[in-house]
């Protein structure tokens, strides 16, 4: 097991997007604009669905015909087994935006995993807390593997990965629901930077401190955060 991790500086990174089926996907358009402007990117890879307006990328189609969790697992398994993909890459969702210049991408967590689980179980105690249940199963597996006090890395930020280590993580959790980020980062002890998540759920004013933002469908289309992102990255990228 790798213990301790530093990500090398002064280099370019392969950016891997997992992309849902959406022929328009304006979030992806602006995410890529933000990457081209602010992130040390070498190549952009698209796993999943590729809108027709997107060009100058490396595309790996993945059929997504299941629910959210099974689709995610299929995408990650495809990435992990893609021998043509460099071992080191940075994983993006299509609703991640790089708002400031980044030289070296880091791992991000917001505290202990058990605290996040307890919060979710309390918040959703009167309904089925599926996500909390998934996180608890991952927490229990980490405990079985001797990893005490694991951190919560399930945030909406770009995340550096080793493809081979991703593959090992998926093998060790193949009987569990999907929560790859927290298992991977704790099992391989990547360390990182502690801070709050950057996901914006409010349509109005928002307060996010840091180099990244993430939106949902409504906040990107209708919210102040979406207007700010579109205004900041108003010029087409070389991938349009």
Q: Residue locations for each model-derived region?
A:
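A conserved donor-nucleotide-binding helix/loop in the catalytic core
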Residues: 25-36, 62-92
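Acidic metal-phosphate-binding loop of nucleotide-sugar-dependent transferases
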Residues: 96-97
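Membrane-interface amphipathic segments in extracytoplasmic regions
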Residues: 4, 17, 71-77, 110, ...
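Short glycine-/acidic-enriched loop or helix-start segments at secondary-structure transitions
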Residues: 55-57, 91, 100-103
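Catalytic core and acceptor-binding pocket of nucleotide-sugar-dependent glycosyltransferases
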Residues: 129-220
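Conserved donor-nucleotide/metal-binding helix-loop-beta segment in metal-dependent transferases, i.e.
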Residues: 100-131
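N-terminal anchoring/stem segment of glycosyltransferases
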Residues: 1-66, 190-191, 208-240
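Aromatic-acidic/polar surface patches that form glycan- and anion
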Residues: 20-28, 68-72, 120, 124-134, ...
């Amino acid at each position: 097991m790798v213990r301790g991790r530093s990500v090398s500086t002064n280099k370019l990174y392969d950016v891997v997007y997992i992309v849902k089926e959406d022929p328009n996907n304006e979030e992806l358009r602006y995410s890529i604009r933000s990457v081209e402007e602010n992130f040390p990117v070498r190549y952009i890879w698209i796993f999943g669905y590729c809108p027709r307006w997107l060009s100058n990328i490396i595309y790996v189609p993945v059929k997504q015909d299941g629910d959210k969790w099974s689709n995610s697992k299929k995408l990650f398994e495809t990435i992990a087994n893609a021998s043509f993909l460099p071992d080191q890459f940075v994983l993006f969702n299509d609703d991640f935006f790089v708002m400031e210049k980044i030289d070296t991408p880091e791992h991000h967590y917001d505290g202990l995993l058990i605290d996040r689980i307890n919060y979710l179980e309390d918040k959703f105690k009167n309904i089925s807390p599926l996500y909390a249940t998934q996180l608890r199963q991952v927490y229990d597996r980490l405990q079985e593997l001797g990893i005490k006090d694991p951190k919560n890395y399930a945030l909406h930020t770009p995340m550096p990965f080793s493809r081979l280590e991703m593959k090992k993580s998926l093998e060790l959790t193949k009987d569990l629901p999907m929560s790859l980020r927290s298992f991977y980062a704790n099992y391989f002890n990547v360390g990182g930077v502690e801070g709050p998540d950057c996901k914006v759920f409010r349509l109005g004013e928002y307060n996010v401190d840091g180099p990244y933002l993430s939106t949902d469908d409504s906040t990107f289309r209708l919210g102040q955060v979406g207007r700010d992102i579109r205004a900041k990255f108003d010029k087409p990228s070389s991938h349009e």
